[in-house]
Amino acid sequence: MSEATGAGTARELLWTPSERRTRGSRMADFQSWVNRDRAVPLIGYDELWGWSVEDLDGFWGAVWSYFDVLASARPSAVLAERAMPGAVWFPGARLNLAENVLRHARDDRPAVVGISEHREREVLTGRDLVRQVASLAGELRAMGVRPGDRVAAYLPNIPQAVVALLATAAVGAIWSCCAPDFGTDGVLDRFRQIEPTVLLGVDGYRFGGRDVERLDTLAELSAALPSVRHTVVVEHLRAGGTPPAGALSFDALVAGDPPPRYEQVPFDHPLWILYSSGTTGVPKGIVHSHGGILLEHLKSHALHFDTGPDDRVFVFASTAWMVWNVLVTALAVGATIVTYDGNPVRPEPDQLFAICAAERV
């Protein structure tokens, strides 16, 4: 099959889905649902796309209903104020991203699979993940963390980072993360802006066969951030070393088994802070909300990526990249996610493909 380019010449398409696959996709199911439930007669993708950008209230209201978003209070409108900046989406709604992400966790099915260069393959079942998130969220509350407080992390792409993000969201606190390949100055350029109350950090990691210890850096960060009241160490490398004075053990904080509790927050309540690249000065914080991320990522994972409960999702990503956050929210459609902390081309150049094959991604 070929398509015409702007210059009028034809080029060969690398791949196009079969009609059977298209008809069986979640995008097709959503379109059929819209036709039936909303009485909007849409034929083909172009009409669906046109409706999505022309009728914002109708489309995003349909996304909310189609995915049956969990909310303790329903919104009074979809788009109450269209001014930009300042648009107001789903006023009156109260929900929590972590609750919606974890609702599809199955007790005995893998939710998170962790691969790294130096540790055995680690699996968190749905039961494990929900329990650890609830335990850490309870410990954060016991530390005095409240909705709107910032929790900063200095962690690699490992299952513990997934737990920490979701626990922070469960409390209604605001997550922000830098990868441990960042130096002290790069991290402080970001975290000083947000004044975190809790700092979670890794003891070290292995990349390309080389151990990189990070306890000294974590101590420097903790000392340079006067807002930090508690420092938590994730023992990943386990190479020894002295943790910062008074540091708490992540393993101990996730050992409890309390009932899950999810703080109900407004749709636009801050969820996490990402950062610009820093090429034009100090990196700028970019805030995303519980509701906005939930709807956008449900749409992306289910409709665009055609992902569901029988799928496994793997993204090679640093925790400092927004695509890592997207990996985590694949849990919201019931998928299993695979994390990898290590070199993408060692021990062999096809390392990432080997992981995909072994984990049936």
Model regions: which residues?
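AMP-dependent adenylate-forming
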Residues: 32-41, 77, 98-125, 235-242
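Conserved AMP-binding/adenylation subdomain of ANL enzymes
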Residues: 294-312, 321-361
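Conserved adenylation A10 loop of the ANL superfamily
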Residues: 118-120, 273-285, 301
